[in-house]
Amino acid sequence: VFNCQAPDEGNMHTLLHWATDEQKEKYLKPLVNGVSSSCFAMTEPEVAGSDPTLIRTNGIKDGDEWILNGHKWFISGARRAKFAILIARTEMDVPEGSRGANTAFIIDLPSQGWNDVREVATMHGATGHSEIVIEDLRVHDSQILGGRGNGHRLGQYRLGPARLAHCMRWVAQAETALDMMVERSLNRFSHGSLLA
């Protein structure tokens, strides 16, 4: 109801800070108005799940376009998203593990080459978490978000506040569940007596 659920809320802040005016008009405005939805595609099944400097998804320059190939997973909200913010390695001359090797792209969805192969099962099912295989997906230079080589910085900017928001949300839900259990145990009669 407040349009502040992940992943859209974090993507709004990211677009506000990193997007061009044209990108803000096309992606941020509809997202803020609640008529669009998004996902953030950084996590990968190999080492880049815990270290985004080691992302294997890559982008190869081809004229004024990029050809993207790779594998992402636990991508929250991908099945309902109208666009994705995707992080890919583009600077092949930069040593692996360097912070300047990755670039962020805005991907219109659906797109040819973006394959949602399955939903990854988790305890939290509100937005769903997809496994995505990217095969020869073409994007224009104008779809770069935040400039070449800034994907790691953008990702950290995006995820820092999001991690805090997730923690607040889950702690509040756990506290509410505990309060409900205490209330129930103090007022529940079973076999002629209170549980507590």
Regions found by a protein language model. Name each.
Residues 114-196:
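Glycine-rich beta->alpha junctions and the first turn(s) of the following alpha-helix
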Residues 1-37, 76-83:
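Internal helix-loop-helix
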Residues 50-53, 64, 77-82, 96-100, ...:
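Short glycine/proline-enriched turns and hinge-like loops at secondary-structure junctions
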Residues 20, 70, 105, 134, ...:
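Residue-level signal for inorganic ion chemistry
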Residues 34-43, 87:
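A short, Trp-centered hydrophobic/proline-enriched beta-strand micro-motif
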Residues 71-115:
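A short core secondary-structure module
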Residues 57-59:
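A structural signal for short hydrophobic beta-strand segments in well-ordered beta-sheet cores
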